[in-house]
Amino acid sequence: MLNNIVITDEERKLFLSWTALDEDLAEVEPDLAEAVLRSRLDFARGDLSRTDYWHDPEGIDVFEDVPYVDDGTRAHRLDLYLPHDSVVRGGKTTPVYIDIHGGGFVYSYKELNRNFCTNLAKLGFAVFSVNYRPAPETDFLGQLEDVAAAFRWIRIHRHEYPIDQNNVFLTGDSAGGTLALYMTAIERSGKFAKAMGVGQSGLTVAGSAFVSPLADLTPYLALCEPGTRKTIEESKETSIVEHIAPTFFAKLHAKKTELTNLATMAEEVEFPPILINTSSDDFIHVESLKLATALVAAGHDVELHDWYTHKGQSLGHVFPVCMSWLDESRETLRMIHDFAYARI
């Protein structure tokens, strides 16, 4: 219990199956720890109503909790979901998606995205789902370094699995979309990789599919300026990303690079084909539109799916990931499939 925040034993047992709670907050300053824990609990209680729908479709082989860094930590593990037919046939032809989960940079592990990943695998993909350290355990650049380490592990070990050795696509939702965007840029641009201080893995990214990505970091980098730190009372009116921004983005802000500007990023990086999915009632709807606009203005190949929600209807944020059983989600998964298969 932190500052009278109550977590029942039942909640703790269940929520820990897909997210950190307070076990990494003991050394964190109290107001930040409280904001993070409240956000994790709010997110987890929201996801709880969907757990009855979580299941693995038939015909998917699962390789769980493979360490990509041998340090024994949960945050440095990945899963691989493979169509059983690919295992039986034993070829090297199944194209690859690497999924990076979201959660406001503070919430969830790969388990939260399992339903999305297994349903994507069912359509004919090998899907790697990667963990990374949540904030405040590390910062934005630390999360990029974690994901890059997972990418390097995949490059080194991919020959051990019946998967395509060349066709690798990325996907990520919300904050995971941010990490997927930045990792796409890192893998496609030595200049961008150097600016971030994150080494390239050697994987060739053939395309990326972003679901409701948080694309524009410039408002959060501005919060790293002196005197902008919000108190816990003020932060109740803002997002968890705004609350963690002064520390979470501090090292990125210190780099003073123009490459975090979407227009500059789009002009400087040789992006592969990009798919972006959002909905009109996505609370960060504008982020997808800003990213698509910047990429199109720079001449990149962009496929934008902007679902319009009518009165009485709701799709919301990252709906294909958190509610993969919806008809709209199944159609989105099919579009993500078609996007990749058209480019292999």
Label every model-predicted segment.
Residues 1-344:
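Alpha/beta-hydrolase superfamily serine-hydrolase fold, recognizing
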